[in-house]
Amino acid sequence: MSKRLVVETHASSCYFRTSVDDGERKALVQITERCNLHCAHCFVSSTETGTDIALHDMVETVLPRLRRAQVTRLTLTGGEPFAHPHLLEICAATARMDLPVKICTNATLTSDEQITALAELGNVRVNVSFDGFRPASHGRFRGNRDSFAVTRETTQRFADAGLLHGILSTPNVLTRPHEFTELCAFAADLGAAYVLMNPLSSFGRGVKSHGRLAAPEQTMRAIAAATAPLADRVELVPIRFPNDTRPLSGCDAGTLIYVFANGDTAVCPYLVFAARTPQSPHADREFLVGNILDGEIADALDRYRFHDRYQVGANPTCRACAVNASCGKGCPAAVIAAGQRIGAPDTEQCPPEAIRLPLIPIPSAGA
């Protein structure tokens, strides 16, 4: 079962839309480092070269060890998963294990034969990335203007086959708010469950591109307003959009795990992405529990209790905040990416001071 992390009462500070029930885990597996595009925001700085997880390793080692670590939901990522020569065989192995799987793709390398085969498996759904809805925005942001037409056409084919699940988008300075109205309408017309939008972050290639390509706050607010009328047709998931009033969501590290193509296994992908940035005061090894190709990871994950190791919100600002008791303190990875140690405020998401500072009673004149 999936558990929603995006709720009306809290700002959506975590990069994930859903988690899993207590006692279960969700795993994202980077089956390849390789990608045919060169996206300005890529968390793992993918290029056309890199490591693949071998089919034998994936089927005989990775998947069984993930199952023994209580993984009940799986996402295949990259790089570009369709660049992996054995994607279909990997998905067939998950079907034999009765393991639901999502594929996150740029939808530029998928053949009709692959779509037919994936649809026949019955356990696969696909999330497609759209970073704008024009060649001059999506295509340019992804390093190939021609990619937009291919992605749009392939997404239609995914939908026709019953495979399309969600649309993933990173608003940026190349996009215009009305594009997201068009994108959400497109998603709704195709029967997508949701459109997830999150800003360009300082992870991977985004460290260098953030300053010149990140969408400003005014644009993010305009996108939220432009897409709001579509909320009755498709679920809108604005991640880390400007927050005016709400306490922050919390961190599910240890439940939402990540396997890198070399087998390194993380308690959260974003903590490792952030720790690998030049500004990080934390080392990536703090968030790695071992290598799944070398041995079992279930016990190491069970022993790793993020909130016992680190105290989020351990700072005067949070302690004095009026919403402290109901606040999850936001995303520790975002704190690290901002050059701070875990425990500092997630200032990018904190509501304004007028909300955070408690009112001080004014004594009456006769007191």
Spans of features found by a protein language model:
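Conserved alpha-helical substructure of the radical SAM core
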Residues: 2-125
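C-terminal accessory region of radical SAM enzymes
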Residues: 216-244, 271-320
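Conserved C-terminal portion of the radical SAM core fold
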Residues: 69-75, 97-102, 123-127, 149-239
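Short glycine-enriched, charge-decorated loop/helix-capping segments at active-site entrances
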Residues: 45-52, 140-146, 210-213, 337
